[in-house]
Every structure is written in structure tokens, then in C-alpha cells.
């Protein structure tokens, strides 16, 4: 009897596919899979859509919620290609920042003062709209300040910031209501424990949010408003005509809607052939919990190309695009070992010197940049509106951009 049982088990194992075989047999390559849309699917899910919002990031969800506020009877659907928003909304660092001094000084070399202050004003207004829409508790919003770090070789840049600080505090203060937003806080360096940092400037009204909680709350708000959300809805192209907007999917079928609002940010060049939107990838890591971590707040290093913050007793650290700009101008996710090595070196030599900090996980996010930092909110054809190019400031400006995009889509003046 025992030999019979053993023989049966051997036969069963021989028939069972290996894990490798299972991976190949049950995981279809969706981007190559084509099929027809059934009558039931077309009539029940896609026939009555009034506005299709493409992209379920901060901009797309804020737009969808605002559309329902403008007209509660409007049938709004959000179409998202990923299981979760694919891009930057769930992959950023959660900084509620609106402008460090060096960034604004650099911007003043490229644009007028009115233009630079206009961008800051939109970022600040966007943050207030996000907080009002989601709520500070749901955001896990903490106004811990945003810090800019200066090394010894950046002494001249620091002095330039110091000279302009009274002027910046006056002009930015008119926007934020803070009389002394920017402040030198070198006395905090010892507590943070950084190595090789000579000066710190804090922007006091800046803070941080929990990106995951933020997006969960936005999804809940959208669904409560009656917005339908379709994940796995991969689009190949958007085609406008007198009959409406034809949305061609990667699965071989299409649907037609009266209006479309495109909120895909870094993927606008790919989907909408918009060369004025440059996709840019950022590498991000989060450490394992760091015993005795003293870092608290959001920090910018090397003109803001590197950034880090505390999160759940860990360090979240990202950036470094300036080390390999051409490679990182891409809308493809993936690692860059040169940049990842630099991030680890920054972590172990500057942020937590003398410690070997285990990395929990890595990921990448895709931003949408351009020659100017003003977002693109415009009607590109009679029935198609775009709200893209957040310039790495999606948390700050995304809600405002989405709401203004919704209003333009419906014919309001913005």
C-alpha cells in the first residue's frame, strides 16, 4: 500500500507544472492580448459616460471629484492603465513643499519675478485645496518644515540666500501669511547628526504627507461622489472627431465619449504626442527602521536634486537625476545603478554617517517636466482637454491643476 501511495505521489508531481512553468502559463502579456468588447460590457459600463478622465493620480482624481461638484448628474469615469496610479502620485516622497530659496533664485534667472511668484502662489493654493479636500488627518499632514542643506563649497550660494532672505520673506509671506518663512537654523545641525553640512535654511510652512493615505482618501472621495474608476484600462491613442472622442485601447477595442480630460503628466508625450512635456525618472529608496533616528522634516541637498525625509522611523531618500540626466529622461521604470550607489553613499556618509543602514526597498517614479514650470492646462481639440506637466510638484499643485482642468473641460473660464 505504501509503495502504491508513493508511486501515485510521484505521478501527481510529474503532472504538476513547476513554479517557473506556472509563471509562464498563468501570466498573460496583457499589452499583447487583444479581444472584442462584449455587448454587455459596452452597454453596462461604457455607454453612459459623459466625461472620461484619463489617469487616476492626484490630478485625475481631483478633476473627477470637481466635475461631480460642478454637475452632480454628470457621469464621470476615471480610466487608469495600472492596478494603482502609474506615474508619480503613489511613488513620490510626500513633500508638501512650494519653493526652496535656491530653487527660486535659479528660477529668477529664467523667468520674471511675477512669473516665479505666480508659480509659488499656485503651489501654495494647491496645497490648501488638497488639505481642504482630503483633510489633514487623512493626509497625515505634518508641518515639520522643509530644509535646504549647504556644504562648505556652497558657502557663496548660502550667502546669496542670506542676502535675499528679508526680501523673500516679505514677498513669499504675502502669499503664505508667514512673516518669517525662511530662517537660518544652523543650531539644529548637531541634533540631526549630519556630516559635512555647514548651514541649514528652513522654509517653516512646508511639511510632509503620507502619499499612500492621501491617494486612498482621494479614491474614497471620488467613489463617494459617484465617480466610476476602471483600472487596467490601457490606452494607445485618443482621437477627437465631430462624433466624440474615440479612446483606442491596447486590447484592440475602443469606446467613444463626449469629452475627455487627459491627466497623465509624465506620459503625455507618449499618449498625446506632446513634446513640451519631458518625462523624467527618479530613483527612490526607503531604509529599514533606523534605531535612534533624529532626522525630522523634509530635506533638500545639492540644489534639490537629492531629497530625503523621515517616515515611520526610517529614511526615505531619492533623486540624483543630475548624475545621469539623459538616461533619466525616460518614461520607462527601471533602476540606474550609478544613481542608486550615489544615494547609498549620501545616506551612509552624510545623513547617517558611520552607520550601515539596511535598505528595505527601491522604486522609481515618472515626472513630467518642461522648459518652464507652469503646468499645461489647455483644450487641445474641441472635446479633449489636457492637465499635465506638474514639474515635480504634484503634491503641491496637483489638486489645483485637476480642478482647473475640470473647469476648462466643461467650458468654464479659468
Locate predicted features.
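Extreme N-terminal leader/targeting segments of oxidoreductases
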Residues: 5-13, 20-51, 69
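Conserved FAD-binding subdomain of flavin-dependent enzymes
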Residues: 66, 84-142, 157-160
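Glycine-rich FAD pyrophosphate-binding loop
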Residues: 71-91
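Flavin (FAD/FMN) cofactor-binding and adjacent substrate-gating region
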Residues: 102-108, 132-144, 148-216, 225
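A conserved short coil-to-beta-strand element within the FAD-binding core of flavoproteins
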Residues: 231-244
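Central helical "cap/lid" subdomain
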Residues: 249-295
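Active-site lid/adjacent beta-loop-alpha segment flanking the redox-cofactor pocket in flavoenzymes
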Residues: 293-374, 378-380
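C-terminal catalytic lobe of FAD-dependent flavoproteins
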Residues: 356-414
Amino acid at each position: 500500500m505504501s509503495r502504491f501511495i508513493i508511486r501515485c505521489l510521484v505521478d501527481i508531481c510529474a503532472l504538476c507544472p513547476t513554479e517557473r512553468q506556472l509563471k509562464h502559463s498563468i501570466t498573460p502579456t496583457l499589452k499583447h492580448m487583444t479581444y472584442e468588447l462584449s455587448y454587455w460590457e459596452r452597454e453596462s459600463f461604457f455607454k453612459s459616460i459623459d466625461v472620461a478622465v484619463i489617469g487616476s493620480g492626484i490630478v485625475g482624481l481631483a478633476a473627477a471629484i470637481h466635475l461631480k461638484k460642478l454637475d452632480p448628474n454628470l457621469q464621470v469615469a476615471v480610466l487608469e492603465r495600472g492596478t494603482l496610479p502609474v506615474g508619480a502620485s503613489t511613488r513620490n516622497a510626500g513633500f508638501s513643499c512650494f519653493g526652496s530659496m535656491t530653487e527660486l533664485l535659479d528660477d529668477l534667472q529664467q523667468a520674471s519675478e511675477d512669473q516665479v511668484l505666480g508659480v509659488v502662489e499656485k503651489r501654495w493654493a494647491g496645497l490648501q485645496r488638497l488639505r481642504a479636500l482630503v483633510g489633514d488627518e487623512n493626509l497625515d499632514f505634518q508641518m515639520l518644515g522643509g530644509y535646504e542643506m549647504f556644504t562648505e563649497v556652497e558657502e557663496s550660494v548660502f550667502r546669496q540666500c542670506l542676502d535675499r532672505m528679508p526680501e523673500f520673506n516679505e514677498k513669499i509671506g504675502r502669499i503664505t501669511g508667514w512673516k518669517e518663512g525662511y530662517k537660518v537654523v544652523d543650531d539644529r545641525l548637531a541634533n540631526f547628526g549630519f556630516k559635512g553640512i555647514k548651514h541649514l535654511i528652513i522654509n517653516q510652512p512646508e511639511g510632509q504627507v503620507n502619499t499612500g493615505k492621501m491617494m486612498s482618501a482621494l479614491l474614497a472621495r471620488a467613489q463617494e461622489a459617484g465617480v466610476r474608476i476602471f483600472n487596467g484600462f490601457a490606452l494607445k491613442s485618443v482621437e477627437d472627431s465631430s462624433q466624440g472622442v474615440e479612446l483606442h485601447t491596447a486590447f484592440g477595442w475602443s469606446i467613444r465619449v463626449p469629452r475627455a480630460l487627459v491627466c497623465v503628466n509624465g506620459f503625455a508625450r507618449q499618449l498625446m504626442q506632446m513634446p513640451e512635456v519631458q518625462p523624467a525618472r527618479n530613483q527612490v529608496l526607503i531604509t529599514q527602521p533606523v534605531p535612534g533616528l533624529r532626522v525630522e522634516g523634509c530635506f533638500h541637498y545639492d540644489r534639490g536634486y537629492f531629497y530625503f525625509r523621515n517616515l515611520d522611523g526610517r529614511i526615505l531618500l531619492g533623486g540624483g537625476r543630475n548624475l545621469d540626466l539623459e538616461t533619466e529622461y525616460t518614461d520607462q521604470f527601471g533602476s540606474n545603478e550609478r544613481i542608486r550607489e550615489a544615494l547609498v553613499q549620501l545616506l551612509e556618509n552624510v545623513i547617517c554617517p558611520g552607520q550601515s543602514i539596511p535598505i528595505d526597498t527601491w522604486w522609481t517614479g515618472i515626472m513630467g517636466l518642461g522648459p518652464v514650470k507652469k503646468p499645461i492646462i489647455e483644450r487641445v481639440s474641441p472635446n479633449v482637454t489636457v492637465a499635465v506637466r506638474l514639474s515635480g510638484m504634484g503634491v503641491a499643485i496637483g489638486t489645483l491643476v485637476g480642478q482647473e482642468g475640470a473647469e476648462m473641460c466643461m467650458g468654464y473660464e479659468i
